[in-house]
């Protein structure tokens, strides 16, 4: 599993562009920048839609004022779903990153297997602060949204 001090893997993921899904390299997102990335088990799921993503959307200006260049939300969903979820949640200040096949999540060692619930392999709920591609903070939530909440990450940035 990835840990503080590790460099994020270089991979290609997807975002929803104006004309459809567009590839984006993790190096383009993280290298030379300070980034807050949080991951959720699934777009449009209750905890993710009522608490996790809205917390970052509401606090986006404060997070960026604390020296963060970008905020990224990642899920093992496709770009169409991530794009629609971002619009639904008014998450204009957040890069909605699709890890459609879960390869990035697997490379991080942060897979959550929800096959017993017919949801397949997803991402664990976490948040990290990444500086120039290197993990500075990694908070993983096993159940409730606490360690990976926007408020907790904002406090860590101060």
Where are these regions (language model features)?
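Chalcogenol-based redox active-site neighborhoods
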Residues: 1-158
